[in-house]
């Protein structure tokens, strides 16, 4: 017995000497406290479009991914509650029946009824229960931030799809006008060819132009169908749901995001906070695994009774006490490997956090660049549209006084329509990139 105690003591001390080969740290979630910096998570309302606001509210109620994230949060809270219950004693009851006889004597069966209540409590001498509870609490935080991230991503996707729908519908009208003008040009070319004033190659070219315009219109209508499907999936509605788009794209105002927000504002991103929460959960998981290098001590007390009569077995006249000591470190190899596995889980979580932070920085950098480029392109498209509008006005006057042919007039009108489509697309790209900046930063920040 003395030798066994010595062996256990040696293994225990050896377990205490086992440490992670990596420095395990507990990370904290950055709380931004800057009186000169305010965040706005309802940035989409700045577009002043009631239809957009209504669709976002509907999506927040119906979206399947958001519901799933909400259920995951509820589940993690329940799991945390179960683990927190380990701080309290555990009450249990038991009831049993036993019948036996001595077959060598042929006695009758001796019946015994046993009933009892027991109360047990594990002493958290080495912090295993506390660490497990902390891990569960951080898992709840992770689920909260994951829900927030799903919500942010949903809003951004819906805003982008909504503006795309308006752009496509506006562009569809221009494409239809373009097709009508191209067909008018085709009739003019055919008439000229019939009177010998045009070559057959001109007929082939205009026919090819008509086909290309038809193809562009069909492709645009396919984009409308695809985007409508995306919108309905985000909203969680069926095909019979009537999508409403109140404004034309040129009526929607820009929100002018601030491109000089301090770097530390990235700590507001929900996915970054989720990664930190997961990192902390893995840290405490490691502490739980490391606690197995120490003994586990439980105290117990109980009331019980045994009687030959069932009705007399509930007296609970027998009081008992117990002390239970578990030595998980005796299975040293498995305990050590579990600790090493928890160490690797922590390192994976740390790597995921560092990668997420780097991805976030690159996403913001890209979003700023795309926004600035789209803003410049929008200004160029507006200037080009203004010049083509003046040229078309000149063509109208020239055609009115017979200084130009119908073909040149229609060509000028077609160029104007193409410029209007280009300007619409540039406006959509700018609006989309504005929303992407707010998604990349986790909110709209204003100094």
Where are these regions (language model features)?
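Membrane-embedded beta-strand positions in outer-membrane beta-barrel channels/transporters
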Residues: 56, 114-118, 162, 262, ...
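Periplasmic alpha-helical coiled-coil/stalk elements that build and connect Gram-negative outer-membrane
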Residues: 138, 145-261, 367-370, 374, ...
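Sec-dependent signal peptide recognition
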Residues: 1-7
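Short segments within alpha-helical structural elements
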Residues: 183, 212-240, 370, 382-443
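Bacterial Sec-pathway N-terminal export signals of envelope proteins
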Residues: 17-79, 246, 250-280, 329
């Amino acid at each position: 017995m003395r030798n066994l105690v010595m062996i256990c003591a040696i293994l225990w001390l050896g377990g205490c000497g086992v440490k992670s080969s990596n420095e395990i740290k507990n990370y904290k979630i950055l709380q931004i406290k800057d009186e000169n910096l305010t965040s706005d998570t309802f940035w989409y309302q700045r577009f002043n479009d009631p239809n957009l606001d209504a669709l976002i509210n509907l999506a927040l109620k119906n979206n399947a991914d958001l519901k799933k994230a909400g259920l995951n949060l509820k589940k993690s809270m329940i799991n945390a509650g179960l683990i927190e219950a380990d701080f309290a004693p555990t009450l249990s009851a038991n009831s049993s029946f036993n019948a036996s006889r001595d077959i060598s004597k042929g006695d009758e069966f001796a019946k015994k009824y046993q009933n009892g209540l027991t109360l047990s409590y594990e002493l958290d001498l080495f912090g295993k229960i506390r660490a497990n509870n902390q891990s569960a609490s951080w898992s709840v935080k992770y689920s909260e931030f994951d829900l927030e991230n799903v919500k942010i991503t949903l809003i951004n996707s819906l805003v982008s799809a909504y503006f795309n729908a308006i752009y496509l519908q506006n562009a569809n009208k221009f494409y239809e006008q373009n097709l009508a003008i191209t067909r008018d040009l085709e009739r003019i070319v055919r008439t000229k060819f019939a009177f010998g004033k045009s070559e057959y190659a001109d007929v082939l070219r205009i026919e090819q132009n008509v086909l290309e315009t038809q193809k562009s219109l069909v492709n645009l209508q396919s984009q409308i169908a695809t985007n409508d499907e995306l919108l309905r999936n985000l909203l969680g509605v069926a095909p019979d749901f009537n999508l409403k788009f109140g404004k034309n794209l040129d009526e929607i105002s820009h929100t002018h995001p601030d491109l000089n927000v301090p770097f530390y504002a990235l700590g507001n991103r929900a996915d970054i906070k989720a990664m930190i929460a997961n990192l902390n959960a893995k840290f405490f998981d490691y502490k739980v695994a490391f606690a197995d290098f120490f003994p586990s001590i439980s105290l117990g007390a109980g009331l019980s009774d045994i009687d030959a009569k069932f009705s007399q077995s509930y007296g609970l006249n027998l009081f008992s006490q117990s002390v239970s000591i578990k030595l998980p470190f005796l299975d040293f190899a498995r305990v050590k490997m579990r600790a090493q596995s928890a160490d690797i889980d922590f390192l994976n979580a740390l790597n995921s956090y560092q990668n997420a932070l780097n991805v976030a920085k690159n996403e913001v950098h890209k979003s700023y660049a795309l926004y600035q480029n789209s803003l410049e392109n929008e200004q160029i498209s507006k200037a080009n549209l203004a010049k083509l509008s003046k040229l078309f006005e000149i063509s109208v006057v020239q055609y009115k006084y017979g200084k130009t042919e119908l073909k040149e007039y229609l060509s000028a009108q077609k160029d104007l329509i193409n410029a209007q489509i280009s300007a619409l697309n540039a406006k959509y790209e700018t609006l989309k990139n504005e929303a992407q900046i707010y998604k990349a930063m986790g909110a709209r920040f204003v100094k």
